[in-house]
Design a protein with these regions (language model features):
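Conserved glycine-rich cofactor-binding loop
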Residues: 8, 15-16
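Alpha-helical segment proximal to the catalytic Tyr-Lys
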Residues: 128, 171-175, 236
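Active-site helix of classical SDR
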Residues: 123, 158
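Residue(s) in the substrate-gating loop at a strand-loop-helix junction
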Residues: 142
């Protein structure tokens, strides 16, 4: 408890799934949390209520991370509410399973605008609030960045790009006392995975479980606990890394 006491954290895409779990785990550890959402105000408000009902501090802020003006407003609201920023979690994601014949220009931009441009914009904005004290960035990537999935060429490519950004920026931002790491979740049960076609009993789920040594799909809290570790001083000498949290599926 209190590993993140008095820290201020922005978690993008935090109205459900992994992002919601990270926001709630951060709050339990003492962080003040900005629960970002793009469209699901109801979900974000629910996360905030769960946090505040337990004595934590959180606010919900709408922003589409692929839009520069929205990102600027997100961090202006953060500064207005808490005056500073210590932790950024880039969790907002767009994902579709599409065979190559169905990949459109629009689908390309949807994936890359949210999954690659979004983190670039939020990182730029966060650096201004980190200031001289430095900060901590966690990018939620995917094991698909190392082991691309069939019918997921766009999604896999965006996550590979995000890992490259993590590595490059670790070398650039270390002198500013900013740590940056990626978490690579395995097959995790989330609303997003379900909407992408990974449903209970589906062939995708059977494939994932068959290739996971621990024999189950992950839960959002499995990822959230790793995020707490990376956000805390326990990980003070860790930067530029890709941490696989996959039940052994993505061992590398």
């Amino acid at each position: 408890m209190n590993k993140l006491k008095n820290k201020v954290a922005v978690v993008t895409g935090a109205s459900k799934g992994i992002g919601a779990s990270i926001a709630k785990h951060f709050a339990v550890e003492g962080a003040k949390v900005i629960v970002n959402y793009a469209t699901s105000k109801e979900g974000a408000d629910k996360v905030v209520k769960e946090i505040t009902d337990k004595g934590g501090t959180a606010i919900a802020v709408q922003a589409d991370v692929s839009k520069e003006a929205d990102v600027i407003r997100l961090f202006e609201e953060t500064k207005k509410a808490f005056g500073t920023l210590d932790i950024l979690v880039n969790n907002a994601v767009f994902q579709q399973f599409l065979p190559i014949e169905q990949v459109s220009v629009a689908a390309f931009h949807q994936h890359f605008d949210v999954n690659v441009l979004g983190p670039i914009l939020t990182i730029q904005a966060s650096l201004k609030l980190f200031g001289d004290k430095g900060g901590n960035i966690i990018n939620i990537s995917s094991g698909a960045s190392k082991y691309p999935l069939p019918s997921a060429s766009l999604y896999s490519a965006t996550k590979a790009a995000l890992d490259a950004i993590t590595i490059s920026l670790s070398k650039e931002l270390g002198v500013k006392n900013v740590r940056i790491n990626s978490i690579l979740p395995g097959a995790t049960e989330t609303e997003g995975a379900t909407s992408a076609g990974v449903t209970s009993g589906s062939e995708y789920e059977k494939m994932f479980i068959a290739n996971t040594p621990l024999g189950r799909r992950g839960q959002p809290e499995d990822i959230a606990k790793a995020a707490v570790f990376l956000a805390s001083d326990d990980a003070a000498w860790i930067t530029g890394e890709q941490i696989s949290v996959s039940g052994g599926m993505y061992g590398f």
